[in-house]
Amino acid sequence: MPKYRSATTTHGRNMAGARALWRATGMTDADFGKPIIAVVNSFTQFVPGHVHLRDLGKLVAEQIEAAGGVAKEFNTIAVDDGIAMGHGGMLYSLPSRELIADSVEYMVNAHCADAMVCISNCDKITPGMLMASLRLNIPVIFVSGGPMEAGKTKLSDQIIKLDLVDAMIQGADPKVSDSQSAQVERSACPTCGSCSGMFTANSMNCLTEALGLSQPGNGSLLATHADRKQLFLNAGKRIVELTKRYYEQDDESALPRNIASKAAFENAMTLDIAMGGSTNTVLHLLAAAQEAEIDFTMSDIDKLSRKVPQLCKVAPSTQKYHMEDVHRAGGVIGILGELDRAGLLNRDVKNVLGLTLPQTLEQYDIIVTQDDAVKNMFRAGPAGIRTTQAFSQDCRWDTLDDDRSNGCIRSLEHAYSKDGGLAVLYGNFAENGCIVKTAGVDDSILKFTGPAKVYESQDDAVEAILGGKVVAGDVVVIRYEGPKGGPGMQEMLYPTSFLKSMGLGKACALITDGRFSGGTSGLSIGHVSPEAASGGSIGLIEDGDLIAIDIPNRGIQLQVSDAELAARREAQEARGDKAWTPKNRERQVSFALRAYASLATSADKGAVRDKSKLGG
C-alpha cells in the first residue's frame, strides 16, 4: 500500500518544524493525515484565457476540503502567444512550457503533495501541466478555463463571426479601411477564455478529454457559461476520490500514466486529426508521451493521419464554426462518438470519472444519450456580452446540432474529407518529418511546386511579404527558427496572416523549422526536422531552388541533386564555429533562452530537452 507522500512532512517528531509551518498556513491537528492536494492555478491578468481564473482555485479548494482533503493552491506563469506574437516576446513562448512543467514539479515535490487539480487554459500552460502530471505520476484532474465566445460584427449589412486571426489579417490588409479594421479589432475577442477557434489552447483542452484526464465538456463549454462551474466543483470532489483510491486502496488505475496510456494517446491524436486541431498539438503530445515513458512517435502520428478522416472543421479552417458550435454539436464526445462508430478508436481506456470509452459515449454522446441533463449541458451557448467574468451567463441554444450530414460534426459517411486535418510529410530536407494542417489547405494547392525565397528570420520574411518581394508561386522558407535556432521555435502566424493580407493565401507556400499558431491556415508547413541549427538540410536551401510539395502522397522535396546538397553541406561545415547559424541576423538572446537552446531537441522529438546531454 503506497504511503501518502505528504506524511513525509506531517508525521514524526523530527517534522515538528514542518508541521509548525503547515499550522501557519491554517492547518490543524485534524488535517495531518488527510491527503494534501495541490490546486495548480494559472491566473494572470495578462492573458484573456486566464484572467477569470483568480477565484476558481478557491472554488476547487472548497470542494476538496468538503470531501476530506487539504487543498493548497499555487500559481504558474502563463504566456499569451497572441500578445507575444510578432516580436521578441515569442522567443519565450515554447520555453515557458518547460518552465511551467518544472515549476509544478518543484512545488509538488518540495512540499510532498499527494495529488493535483490543474487549472489551465492557454497554449503552453495545458501542455506544461500535462508534462508535469505524467512526470510526477500522482492522481490528477485537469479543468481548463474554457473557450472564448466568438466575436461578431456587422459588415456590409451582414453579421459575421470573428476571432483574433481576423483582426490580424484585416489590420495588415491595405485594402481594408482604418474604420473597418478598428471595428473588427474591437469585436474579435469579446470575452474571457481561450481564443474562440480550434487554435492550440482549445485543441489541447479537447485532447485532455481524449486522454481521459478531464471531464466531458472540458474542451468546448464556454468560459462565460454558468454550466462550466460544475466542472470545477466536480473536479474538487473527484480528485479526493482518486487520491484515496490510490493511496488507501492501492489502485494504480487512478494514476495518470495508467489513464493516459498509449491507447489513450492514439485516441487523442486520432481526435486531433479528425477535428483539424493545431499543429502544435503534435509537438506537445510527443513531449507528454516522453514524460509518461510511452513509445509514441512521429511514425505513429503518420500512420494515424493516413486513415483518419476529417469529421469537424472549425475556425481558422472555416469562419462558419467556432468552439461554441462544436459544443452545440456534442463537443469532444460528439467527435469521439463518430470516430468510435467508424471503428477508429481504442475502446479499452478509462477516464478520471472511472468510465470506459463505451460508457462515456453512452452517457455523454448526444446522438445516443437518454440523459436530458447532458443534452441540456451541450445546449449551453454564447450571450454576446463583453465580460471578463467566468460563469456570467446562462444562455442556451434552442436546439442541439445533431445533423451529422451537414452540421459542424460529421459522420464518417459525410466527412469533410477522407484525409484527416493533419499530415506528416517526409523528404530530402525533412528527413525526420514536418507537419501541415491539411484542414486549412485549399484543395487547389495540395500539390504545389515553386521557387524558394529563403529568410533567416521571421522578421525578414515579414518585411519581404509586406514589401511585395514575395509573389504568387513562391515558396517562402524561414529557417533558424527552430527550438535551438530561434531559440524557442517562434510561431509564424504573422507571416501566414500577411500572405493572406497581400492576396497570396492560396498562391504561396510557407515552410519553416519553426512552428505555427493554431490560428494558421493555408499551405503552411512547419516543424521541419532536423532543424537548421542542428545541421538539418533546410539550412542548405538557396534562393530559387525548386521545392515540390505533395500532400496527398505525404512528400516534400528539394529538387536539387544529392551531389549539390553534399557540396553545400561541405561548404556549410567549412564555416567552423559559424556553421549552421544564420547569416547577418542580429538578435539579442538572453542567458535564460541560451540555456534552453543548449538542451533543446528538434520538433520531431517534441522540442523537449536532450536528457543525454545531462547524462540521463
UniProtKB/Swiss-Prot annotation:
**Cofactor binding note:** Binds 1 [2Fe-2S] cluster per subunit. This cluster acts as a Lewis acid cofactor.
Which residues are involved in binding [2Fe-2S] cluster?
122, 195
Catalytic residues, per the record, are: 517
Name any cofactors this protein relies on: [2Fe-2S] cluster; Mg(2+)
Q: Which residues cross the membrane?
A: none
Which Pfam families does the record associate with it? ILV_EDD_C, ILVD_EDD_N
GO terms under biological process: isoleucine biosynthetic process; L-valine biosynthetic process
> Which Gene Ontology cellular component terms are annotated?
cytosol
The record's section on PROSITE patterns has: ILVD_EDD_1 (PS00886), ILVD_EDD_2 (PS00887)
EC top class, in one word?
lyase
Which catalysed reactions does the entry list for this protein?
(2R)-2,3-dihydroxy-3-methylbutanoate = 3-methyl-2-oxobutanoate + H2O; (2R,3R)-2,3-dihydroxy-3-methylpentanoate = (S)-3-methyl-2-oxopentanoate + H2O
What is a GO molecular function of this protein? magnesium ion binding
Per UniProt, the keywords (alphabetical) are: 2Fe-2S, Amino-acid biosynthesis, Branched-chain amino acid biosynthesis, Iron, Iron-sulfur, Lyase, Magnesium, Metal-binding
Entry EC number(s): 4.2.1.9
Task: Cite the annotated pathway.
Answer: Amino-acid biosynthesis; L-isoleucine biosynthesis; L-isoleucine from 2-oxobutanoate: step 3/4; Amino-acid biosynthesis; L-valine biosynthesis; L-valine from pyruvate: step 3/4
Residue positions, PTM N6-carboxylysine: 124
Q: Which residues bind Mg(2+)?
A: 81, 123-124, 491
Quaternary state and partners of this protein?
Answer: Homodimer.
PANTHER family (UniProt xref) = D-XYLONATE DEHYDRATASE, D-XYLONATE DEHYDRATASE YAGF-RELATED
Q: What does this protein do?
A: Functions in the biosynthesis of branched-chain amino acids. Catalyzes the dehydration of (2R,3R)-2,3-dihydroxy-3-methylpentanoate (2,3-dihydroxy-3-methylvalerate) into 2-oxo-3-methylpentanoate (2-oxo-3-methylvalerate) and of (2R)-2,3-dihydroxy-3-methylbutanoate (2,3-dihydroxyisovalerate) into 2-oxo-3-methylbutanoate (2-oxoisovalerate), the penultimate precursor to L-isoleucine and L-valine, respectively.
Q: Which HAMAP family match?
A: IlvD
Similarity section: Belongs to the IlvD/Edd family.
Name of protein: Dihydroxy-acid dehydratase
- Give the encoding gene's name: ilvD
